[in-house]
């Protein structure tokens, strides 16, 4: 075993210990969804619950079956949560490198732990959130890591990938992301036009149709509208888009949105490394730099820009009519355009950058679509979970394309990430 392998295994051990420490602190909550689903089978059978739930509340058939069937077996989710994080991060490394890479996996794990705590608490460490957000995200990442592999796909790996669709395509955000990503790759990359890809897309379409065609979806929409946002069905398209963008705005300007700041930093590097940089590139570089400076000042508590501008609090009647709120929307939209510009220009030079470009676009789309639900605000921070994971994936991809050949730099970055995590505990 050479020195580099020993270093990689040492990093992996630290990552495992970090996840084990988190897993040891996990527990079922004695209220809300954890309480409901842990007792739901006391007066009914699993079969009857699933049929009734599909017809009256949700199309998440397989996820609900897995959740209510295993939630009272604590070892299932105590092991399943950290294992899903590992599968998710290992899949990110496969998408990034083209094969499993231990160091990129470890780096992904520690960057994952820097996703805003409120988002992780809702989408990853909360037991019900694990079944509905982390698990389908991990399944999506694995299935796409197989789909994105060039050349023929072995029948074992292909079967596992299709099996994962039975989880990822039974969650609204991951099902849309899976379908969109696979369609995008087939349209723009000829190497993915193969028999497995068409079987994959057909399977995803059928399962997604099963999810969205559930009779319970309409009933749930009516119930949630009455409970959380009466009159939502009569809101205009523009209003619903504003609701969705307000959640995007929140994700971008949260003081602890470290992952998105990392993406902005990497995109800034892409622009500055462009030898054919134009005035447009300089403008977006200035936008990204300005955003990073503002976020640093907000993070340090030096800058407080009011109740609306670069404030992560959600819309209320006061902010709805505030000019500074819409100015904040405008600035953050420029930041998003700056990220997309950097990736689009890079994709022209290097076709591989199509992947992070599409990941970022889809990530924002998964949040924007939440604006069409009356629970756009009631759902809390968990609706930002998939977005954060996709921003993490894009960041890892860009970092590897820029510095993948510099092992010492990767080692140093991993050490810094580990140290920062330890200090944040």
Question: Model-flagged regions — what are they?
Answer:
Residues 156-183, 206:
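Membrane-interface alpha helices of multi-pass inner-membrane proteins
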Residues 157-158, 285-289, 336-337, 341-360, ...:
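Signature aromatic-anchored transmembrane alpha helix within multi-pass, membrane-resident enzymes
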């Amino acid at each position: 075993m050479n020195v580099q392998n020993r270093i990689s295994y040492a990093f992996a051990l630290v990552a495992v210990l970090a996840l084990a420490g988190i897993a040891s602190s996990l527990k079922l909550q004695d209220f809300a969804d954890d309480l409901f689903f842990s007792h739901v089978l006391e007066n009914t059978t699993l079969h009857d619950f699933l049929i009734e739930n599909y017809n009256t509340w949700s199309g998440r058939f397989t996820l609900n079956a897995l959740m209510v069937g295993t939630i009272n077996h604590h070892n299932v989710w105590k092991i399943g949560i950290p294992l899903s994080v590992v599968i998710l991060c290992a899949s990110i490394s496969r998408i990034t490198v083209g094969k499993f890479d231990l160091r990129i996996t470890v780096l992904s794990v520690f960057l994952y732990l820097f996703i805003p705590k409120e988002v992780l608490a809702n989408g990853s460490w909360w037991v019900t959130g694990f079944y509905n957000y982390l698990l389908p995200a991990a399944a999506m990442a694995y299935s796409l890591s197989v789909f994105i592999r060039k050349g023929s796909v072995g029948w074992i790996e292909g079967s596992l990938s299709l099996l994962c669709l039975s989880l990822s395509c039974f969650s609204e955000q991951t099902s849309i992301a899976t379908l969109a990503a696979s369609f995008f790759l087939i349209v723009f990359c000829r190497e993915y036009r193969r028999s497995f890809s068409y079987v994959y897309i057909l399977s995803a379409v059928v399962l997604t149709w099963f999810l969205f065609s559930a009779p319970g979806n309409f009933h749930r929409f009516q119930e949630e509208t009455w409970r959380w946002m009466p009159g939502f069905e009569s809101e205009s398209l523009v209003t619903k888009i504003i609701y969705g963008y307000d959640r995007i705005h929140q994700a971008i300007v949260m003081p602890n949105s470290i992952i998105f700041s990392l993406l902005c930093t990497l995109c800034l590097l892409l622009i500055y490394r462009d030898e054919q940089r134009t005035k447009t590139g300089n403008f977006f570089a200035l936008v990204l730099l300005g955003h990073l400076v503002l976020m640093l000042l907000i993070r340090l508590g030096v800058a407080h820009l009011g109740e609306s501008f670069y404030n992560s609090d959600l819309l209320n009647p006061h902010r709805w009519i505030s000019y500074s709120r819409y100015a904040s929307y405008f600035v953050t939209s420029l930041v998003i355009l700056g990220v997309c510009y950097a990736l689009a220009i890079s994709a022209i030079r290097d076709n591989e950058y199509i992947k992070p470009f599409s990941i970022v676009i889809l990530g924002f789309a998964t949040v924007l679509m939440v604006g069409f639900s009356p629970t756009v605000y009631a759902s809390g921070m968990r609706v930002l979970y998939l977005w954060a994971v996709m921003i993490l994936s894009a960041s890892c991809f860009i970092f590897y394309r820029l510095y993948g050949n510099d092992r010492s730099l990767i080692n140093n970055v991993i050490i810094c990430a580990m140290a920062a995590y330890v200090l944040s505990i």
